[in-house]
Amino acid sequence: MFLGFLLTLTLGGAGILPAADEEPPPEDPLEAALRIAYEGRKRIQEAIRDYTCILTRRERVDGRQMGYETIFVKVRHPLEEQGRVVQPFSVYVRFLRPDRVKGREVIYVEGRNGGKLIVRNGGTRFAHITTSLLPDSPAAMQHTRYPITEIGVLNLTKRLIENGEQERGNENCEAKLVQGAKINGRSCTVVQVAHKVRGEGLAYKTARILIDDELVVPVHYSAYDWPQTEGGKLVLLEEYTYTDLRLNVGLTDRDFDHRNESYLFLKSYSP
């Protein structure tokens, strides 16, 4: 879907097609990945108002390998009218696994609740405690690499674009683009970016992004550090997979209100 498109060469301002018996020059894999990401960002911003999904993540935090977490997510993208935000970026999550955090609920609405998360603890101890936390506070970041403000496929797309633009022209970077992968039965294109030599300031050795061919949005990202010993396995830094994406389901303010009767937050809590 994304490869093999016709490239035109320019000479003196005129468009010239390759001769019939000539193969068009292959597109650089990194540039192809960026093109897909730009298309995805445009589609998300113009056509996707909100969505629900399942996020499965695994991270290394402060040198500790965390286990898999499975999270149900609702996201509503911001909406502006005449330069005024009429619908802020909004997130609701409920942890499904593991038992340590099962049932935990978190709500974040940009610009509301004093900029804080509303959190119901969940898990096996003090499950119904409801409190407020700054998204980047030590308590909120205790078991994760990123604040909830960076969750979602649009933020993942933006990160892909930022990383790709930084790698342009980097001779230490090798990129590959492979079609035919599947996540949860859905066809995806794989983008792999790898650094050949360890260097100062490199965030990873190898990163893999899977882009849903139909939705044109990234649904998986994983990054690995160099092996701890010569010839050893790459060390997982972070892994995020979005499945069961349901787009434009019509989420409302009630979906991001802790007093929603289907949520288990303390209803009398005032952030």
Regions found by a protein language model. Name each.
Residues 2-13:
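Bacterial N-terminal signal peptides
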Residues 60-62, 97-99, 107, 113-270:
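Gly/Pro-enriched, hydrophobic low-complexity segments
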Residues 19-21:
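Boundary at the C-terminal end of the N-terminal hydrophobic targeting segment
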Residues 31-126:
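N-terminal mature ectodomain segment of secretory-pathway/periplasmic proteins
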